[in-house]
Amino acid sequence: MSFIADKIVMDGLTYDDVLLIPAYSEVLPKTVELSTKFSRNIELKIPFVTAAMDTVTEAKMAIAIAREGGIGVIHKNMSIEEQARQVAIVKRAENGMIYDPVTIKRGSTVADALALMAEYKIGGIPVVDDERCLVGIVTNRDLRFEKDMDKRIDEVMTKENIITTNPTTDMEAVSQILQEHRIEKLPVVDKDNKLVGLITYKDITKAKDKPMACKDSKGRLRVAAGVGVTNDTLDRMKALVDAGADAIVIDTAHGHSMYVIEKLKEAKKCFPDIDIVVGNIATGEAAKALVEAGADGVKVGLGPGSICTTRVVAGVGVPQLSAVYDVAKALKGTGIPLIADGGLRYSGDVVKALAAGGYSVMIGSLVAGTEESPGETIIFNGRKFKSYRGMGSLEAMEHGSKDRYFQSSTSDVKKLVPEGIAARVPYKGTLYEVIYQLVGGLRAGMGYCGAANIEKLHDAKFTRITNAGVLESHPHDVSITSEAPNYSRPE
C-alpha cells in the first residue's frame, strides 16, 4: 500500500477553498429567517456566539450579543465567584419582570442603600419587612441630598401611595401604569402585599428597542459560561447554574478525550436540567461519542483560529470546512446542533460554515476589537487597537487556561507548551456595528442560495476553487481608496 492510499483518509478543505454556488431564489435577503439553535433547548435569533476567551467575552460583551439575538460564553480565566458574578450581571441586565429584585430591610441605613445601589448599578430599591411585605421604595432622588449616612431608610423612603401591580398584569397594562403615574419602577406584589417582583420602565424600553434579543422564559437575557476539566469543575458549574447561566460549555482543546467524556457524564448526572455544550472536536466520530455521553451541543474547530498554533505546534487538526461537514453528517437526526468555532474572517465565511452544516458560529477575532470586549486598548502608530490572545497563549495559560490544554499540573511557566499567541486587532467600534455587517452578509448569501432559513442553507452546494480563484474573489488590480466596513485585505 502507498502512503497516500494507506494514511491519507480525507481531503481537508477550509473556507478559502470553496465558494457557494448560486441557485434559483424566491428569497429576498431581508426576509430570510435567521433563528437557530445554540444547543438542544436554547434558541438564538441570530447564529452568532461570542467566544469564551478572556479578551472577548465578559458580562459587557454577553449583554451586547444577547441584545442582538445571539449568546455570549463568559470565559473561565477568573475565580468561580467572579465568573458567577459576571453571569448574574447579564441575567439582571434586562428583565420582563425581575423575579428576585434587590431589596433592603426597613431597619437599614442610608449608607446600606447607597452601597447596594452602587454594587448593582441601580437607581431604586424596594423596602421590605421581615415577612418580605412591601413597606416602601427608596430611590436616588430620596438620597441625593441626604448627608446623614446613619439615618434609617424608614425616614427617607417613599411610603405613601406606592403604586403596585399584581403578577397577572400584562406588559401593555404595566407600560400604561408607568406612563400614567410617571414612575420608573413598579413593584409586583401578591394578595398579601408580599413583594414577588419588580418591573422597570428601562426594561420595557429595552425590550421595545431590541425585539430580537435572546431571552429566557422570564424575559432575561440568555448567557452561557465556560468551564474546564479540573477538580473544581462541578463546583464551578454549581455556582454558574445558581447564578442563572442558561448553558455550560465544557471548553477544551481536545473534546474527544476520555477525561472530557467522563466529566461530561458526571456533569449531566449532577445538572440534568441545564444544557451542556462540549468542544472542541473535528471529527464525526468525536461528535457521536459526545452525544452518546449526553452532550446537548458540540463545538467544532481544532486549530483554525487566528491566534491558535495547535496545528503548527502539535501537527494536529482538520481544515475547518471539512471538520464542520464531517461532524454535521454524524449529528444528522440526533437533534444536536453544532457550533462552528474559528477560522472566520469575512461574513462570507459565516455563510459557508452554516451551509456546511453549522447551526451557529463562534466568533473571537471578529469581535475582539469592539468596544464591549475586555481586551486592553492600545495606541500604535497613531491607530487604536485592542489586545487579543488565544487561550493557549502563555499569557492566558498563566491566568487559568492551562487545563484547556491538559497542562493544569504544570506550575513552572517555562515548562508550559503554548498552543496560541497574544496579538492585537484594530479597534472596530461597537459590537452592534460588527454584527450588523455580519448579519447583512449572511442574509445576502442566503438570498443568493435561495435559502429561506438556516436549515435550507444546509442544502446549498459548493464549488472547489484554486488559488487563482481566491485571488479573483478579492479586489484586484486596483488601489483601494475607501475602506468598506466589512472588508479588509488578507494579510
Which stretches of residues belong to each language-model region?
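Alpha/beta catalytic cores of nucleotide-metabolism and tRNA/nucleoside-modifying enzymes
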Residues: M1-Y24, I104-K105, N166, G226, ...
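Active-site-adjacent beta->alpha loops and helix N-cap segments on the catalytic face
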Residues: K30, S79-A88, E146-D150, K194-C214, ...
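Short beta->alpha transition motifs characteristic of CBS
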Residues: I74-S79, I122, P126, C133-M149, ...
